[in-house]
């Protein structure tokens, strides 16, 4: 595919490759790294008391002066020790186990993790999903006053986050559904955190959120919406810490690069901006879309997938300052997500779902009319419009071929993405009334959460009064 060189995305970066660990199972994919980058395991566990907070500060001070090489070596040793301890606990009753066998288990585990992370091996979760039982259905665990516009899960699947058109940001427990609300600070505090008030009174005082993202280490929550700012929150304290300025339009989508503090934001001004949450700084902006940017997604590599109202889907290769452009022929893109580093899914306003390859300009497989309007959603009783069949959300269970899509037709559909045959196979339909504006799989594949509401995420093109505004969870039984 032709690579279109894009000026203005920013200067190329130069970085050093890690030479600390020569074990092939520990090495990451070769890539140019930015100045601001950190590792998956460099995190601080959330604290509930002041004493635990002080302990965390002491730990930070202890490693404050170590070099990058020392830090990577320490993290690698911690990872090896943790895996060895886990394997030893699993086989502690086996007296005949020797050191060579334990080493082989550690190497096998590291190899599997690296292959899954790079996308070379995927778990067969789609084949493991068992037939649904009568008790298996969506259950609303968190309620909002207005339509939910975004949902996300922490890396350990224990906590969830949701935002809605009512401006509330909720942090909730997956098992119990108990939620806590993030409190917006005063205008003076927001101004001290970098917020620039707009001339428009509506924009200035509107805290309506349309997108959110959670960092892999569970330290930062990013939200964005009508006020044209990207807001950064500390998950440990649930306090507002920074307001990133720079977008001239509504912030419509957010995502973190896996394993880093690098944050991507898409806006109605057509730009894709890059920030560093840990250092709370702006890095650069990527250009290319000629209209509003609607949805973005990213994995571990420095590549960002985006779709916009200009009927294009673009894959930005940030270090090389290049991008690949994929065009929709008959419809507008509504959402997108990565399947792996070389394949991705898109949802359109004509009700179709498409599977794309990085090597081809056209989709390799299309499911037409994926979300047809079912009988219970007739226009008389539920004010159903053509917007009900728009595919407003797609999600993939990371490291597997299990995917899901949502619209306003009354159900969430599960799919199996077959890379070898380049096909999408339908699996199950999960009834859920309302507009499904956001989806997220648990990393284990054991459940699926959906942000649902009476209205679509980015407008008021339809209204389903029978729907409930909130976050719904559906268990998935794997064999």
Curated annotation (Swiss-Prot):
It holds the Pfam family WD40. GO terms for molecular function: U3 snoRNA binding. SUPFAM superfamilies: WD40 repeat-like (SSF50978). Residues 8-17 have a biased composition (Basic residues). Keywords: Nucleus, Repeat, Ribonucleoprotein, RNA-binding, rRNA processing, WD repeat. The keyword Lyase does not apply. Component of a nucleolar small nuclear ribonucleoprotein particle (snoRNP) thought to participate in the processing and modification of pre-ribosomal RNA. Essential for embryogenesis. May function during late embryogenesis. PANTHER family: U3 SMALL NUCLEOLAR RNA INTERACTING PROTEIN 2, U3 SMALL NUCLEOLAR RNA-INTERACTING PROTEIN 2. This is U3 snoRNP-associated protein-like EMB2271. It comes from Arabidopsis thaliana (Mouse-ear cress).
């Amino acid at each position: 595919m032709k690579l279109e060189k894009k000026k203005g995305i920013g200067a190329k970066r130069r970085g050093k490759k890690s030479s600390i660990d020569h074990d092939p199972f520990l090495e990451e994919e070769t890539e140019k790294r930015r100045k601001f980058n950190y590792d998956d395991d460099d995190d601080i566990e959330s604290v509930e008391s002041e004493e635990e907070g002080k302990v965390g500060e002491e730990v930070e001070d202890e490693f404050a002066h170590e070099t990058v090489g020392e830090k990577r070596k320490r993290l690698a040793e911690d990872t090896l020790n943790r895996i060895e301890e886990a394997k030893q606990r699993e086989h502690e009753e086996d007296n005949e186990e020797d050191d060579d066998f334990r080493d082989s288990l550690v190497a096998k585990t590291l190899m599997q993790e690296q292959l899954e992370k790079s996308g070379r091996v995927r778990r067969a979760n789609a084949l493991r999903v068992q037939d649904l039982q009568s008790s298996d259905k969506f259950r609303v665990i968190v309620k909002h006053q207005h339509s939910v516009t975004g949902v996300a899960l922490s890396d350990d699947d224990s906590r969830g986050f949701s935002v809605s058109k009512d401006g509330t940001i909720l942090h909730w427990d997956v098992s119990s559904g108990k939620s806590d609300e993030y409190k917006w600070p005063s205008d003076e505090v927001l101004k001290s955190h970098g917020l620039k008030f707009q001339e428009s009174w509506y924009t200035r005082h509107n805290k309506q959120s349309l997108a959110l993202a959670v960092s892999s280490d569970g330290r930062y929550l990013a939200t964005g919406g009508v006020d044209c700012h990207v807001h950064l929150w500390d998950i440990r304290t649930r306090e507002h810490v920074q307001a990133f300025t720079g977008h001239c339009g509504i912030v419509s989508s957010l995502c973190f690069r896996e394993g880093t503090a690098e944050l991507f934001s898409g806006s109605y001004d057509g730009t894709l901006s890059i920030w560093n949450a840990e250092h709370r700084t702006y890095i650069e902006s990527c250009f290319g879309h000629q209209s509003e940017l609607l949805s973005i997604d990213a994995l571990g590599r420095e590549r960002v997938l985006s779709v916009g109202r200009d009927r294009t889907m673009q894959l930005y290769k940030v270090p090389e300052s290049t991008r690949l452009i994929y065009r929709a022929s008959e419809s507008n893109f509504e959402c997108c997500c990565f399947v792996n580093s070389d394949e991705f899914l898109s949802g359109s306003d004509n009700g179709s779902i498409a599977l794309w390859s990085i090597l081809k300009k056209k989709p390799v497989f299309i499911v037409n009319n994926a979300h047809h309007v079912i009988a219970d959603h007739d226009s008389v009783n539920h004010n159903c419009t053509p917007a009900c069949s728009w595919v407003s959300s797609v999600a993939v269970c990371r490291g597997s071929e299990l995917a899901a899509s949502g619209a306003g037709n009354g159900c969430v559909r599960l799919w199996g993405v077959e890379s070898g045959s380049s096909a999408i196979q339908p699996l199950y339909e999960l009834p859920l009334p309302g507009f499904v504006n956001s989806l997220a799989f648990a990393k284990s594949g054991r459940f699926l959460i959906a942000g649902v509401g009476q209205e679509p995420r980015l407008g008021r093109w339809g209204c389903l009064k029978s729907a409930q505004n909130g976050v719904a969870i559906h268990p998935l039984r794997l064999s």
